Amino acid sequence: MQSPVVRQVNVRSSSALLDRYRAVRAETLSLVEPLSPEDLMVQSCSEASPAKWHLAHTSWFFETFVLRDFVAGYQDFHPDFHWLFNSYYNSLGDMPAKSLRSSFSRPPLEDILRYRDYVDAAIARLLESQPDYPANAEAVRRIMMGLEHEQQHQELIATDIKHALFTNPLHPAYRDSSARPSAEGIAPPVEWLTFDAGLTQVGFTPDAANAELFSFDNETPRHTVYLAPFSIATRPVTCAEYLAFMDDGGYARPDLWLSEGWVMVREHGWHSPLYWQQDLATKSGWRIYTLTGWQPMDDLSETPVCHLSFFEADAFARWASRHTSGVRLPTEFEWEYAAGQLGTLLRGAPQRPELLTYPLPGDSVAVAATPANMLETGSLHPTRASARSGLQQIFGDVWEWTSSAYTGYPGYRPLPGALGEYNGKFMSSQMVLRGGSCVTPATHIRASYRNFFTPATRWQFSGLRLARDTA
């Protein structure tokens, strides 16, 4: 399969929006196709949810925030689904505890699939009744938000089922090994792209010609920040490089760790990234569990390391600074600025980060225009950087931890009503990640996109790219 290009979808008609709606909904069903009914019920850690619940909740979102508000006389599919499949919207009423989701053997899967069909038909009727696009701009905006929300849950389905299958003592594969990335070659040496100090704009603001482009409220408002001079690595840290940190006693040296991170190491016995195991059967070193089953370290050593917590990423950066002065994690604004400069480096002209199409085919200047490794590639795991020079893998492969705490931008205002709970109430004790991963849909990511997780989170495809101070 040809690798996808990261791009935003600029929807300009009701029919185009309906086509996009159907495509996104179909992709969700394709993700659960390899799973048995029993697989769909598993919830193996506190962060995860059963795939069956994801199927229902994504339909609940459209029913709750679109159909109930914009379809006169709309009848809910089931009177109990409104509270049963609510996730965390407290202003809409009570909901079951997240830890109980795996106990929902009823409603059965057939009812959940009928629920999806019911909601899909209602959305289609709504859009087909509005040939003059957009007849209701707020309804369109909420449908687009629902699609972005569903794409987030597509990634969660992949990460949740990976954890569930790994927890199973049989360690079954989600899909067969035909989609495994090639083990040939080595990652290119790290180079450093250097940027001068100055003021820059960050955040998302569409222009008049692209008013239909979507962003979450936490990407706004666009505002000015000052960046000190910095350099950023041309690729993420690889498994081999992280293994060197481990071999140097990285998990046994408290001087490398933040206090809370060291507590996690001691209390939870961290000694490697999640899904790494020493291969005792063959005594050949490490092996790594992937969605296509176990793979030897030799096959993945040159791919970006993933399933790291922020604490592990930060400890690695501190260790690396002993060898290269000034090395650290980038701030989220340094990352966004570097990502936004792809257009400048390729074409020699400024380009807005949030409207960036990456890669830009046909260009061959400073940045390697290799396609992004995202959900559509089917690799389901980070792949090796190409041998070409320049900034690589800025989108896809692994979410990249930054040193920035997740908080609101100056002038931030959450959305009105229950949708205001989507992002704003989580702006505490979380860190920002950027760039998307190998299971992020290509039409979902953009340079201004802010993901966020607590610093101990490991079950996501999270890795790191280094930055460093420059004089």
Residue ranges and their predicted role:
Residues 146, 150-152, 156, 160, ...:
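Functional-site microenvironments in short loops/helix caps that host divalent-cation chemistry
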Residues 1-49, 53-122, 126-132, 136-165, ...:
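Disulfide-stabilized, aromatic/cysteine-rich ligand-recognition loop
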